[in-house]
Amino acid sequence: TCKQKGEGCSLDVECCSSSCKPGGPLFDFDC
């Protein structure tokens, strides 16, 4: 389940599992 900011994700990106990943293809990082 993906979550948005304010639902367990510290960044303004979708938070899938335990990782926050921006919607773009150039980034891939954890919270």
UniProtKB/Swiss-Prot annotation:
GO cellular component: extracellular region
4-carboxyglutamate sites (modified residues): 14
Tissue: Expressed by the venom duct.
Compartment annotation: Secreted
Record keywords, A-Z: Disulfide bond, Gamma-carboxyglutamic acid, Ion channel impairing toxin, Knottin, Neurotoxin, Secreted, Toxin
Broad class of where this protein is predominantly found: secreted
Disulfide topology: 2-16, 9-20, 15-31
Keyword field contains rRNA-binding: no
Secreted as UniProt keyword: yes
GO molecular function, one term: ion channel regulator activity
Domain notes per entry: The presence of a 'disulfide through disulfide knot' structurally defines this protein as a knottin. The cysteine framework is VI/VII (C-C-CC-C-C).
Role this protein plays: Gamma-conotoxins may act on voltage-gated non-specific cation pacemaker channels (HCN). Elicits toxic effects in the freshwater snail Pomacea paludosa after intramuscular injection, but it has no effect when injected intracerebrally into mice.
Similarity-based family: Belongs to the conotoxin O1 superfamily.
Name of the protein: Gamma-conotoxin-like As7a
Source organism of the structure: Conus cancellatus (Cancellate cone)
